A protein has these predicted regions:
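Beta-hairpin "wing" of winged helix-turn-helix
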Residues: 61-76, 84
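Basic amphipathic alpha-helical segments that dock to polyanions
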Residues: 51-58
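N-terminal helix-turn-helix DNA-binding core of bacterial DNA-binding proteins
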Residues: 6-50
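Amphipathic alpha-helical dimerization/coiled-coil segments
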Residues: 88-115
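Basic, amphipathic "hinge/linker" alpha-helix immediately C-terminal to the N-terminal HTH DNA-binding motif
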Residues: 74-96
Length: 115
């Protein structure tokens, strides 16, 4: 059973990118890495060590879990493990995005007024 979420905002960049990647659907590890690269327009690259280390902590915190959903068996390798966002993970992502919006609003206000 997953522990209560101990990952509070601010989230690490790796955790944020993984949550974003899973927010558009279940993915296996390599699929998550490719989605992170696409989402960041190639600016963020995540290797397997960072990915699986972060995901282990995220599973423990209840942010993500293994998914029973599978892609078309004709197009997929049965050895792949798929992951999905939990309700706690979605809430953590929403809280982090709210925090980012607040930071951006302060920055834009200061830049607009030359501060």
């Amino acid at each position: 059973m997953a522990k209560k979420c101990t990952m509070h905002a601010p989230l690490t960049p790796a955790v944020l990118h993984i949550l974003l990647a899973l927010s558009c659907g279940d993915r296996h590890g390599y699929g998550i890495m490719k989605q992170v690269q696409a989402d960041s327009q190639g600016r963020a690259k995540m290797g397997p060590g960072t990915l699986y280390g972060s995901m282990g902590r995220m599973i423990e915190a209840g942010l993500i879990r293994e998914s029973d959903k599978r892609a078309d068996p004709e197009m997929d390798d049965e050895r792949r493990i798929y992951y999905e966002l939990t309700g706690t993970g979605r809430a953590a992502l929403e809280a982090e995005l709210k925090r980012y919006r607040s930071v951006v609003a302060v920055a834009e206000g200061r830049l607009a007024h030359g501060q």
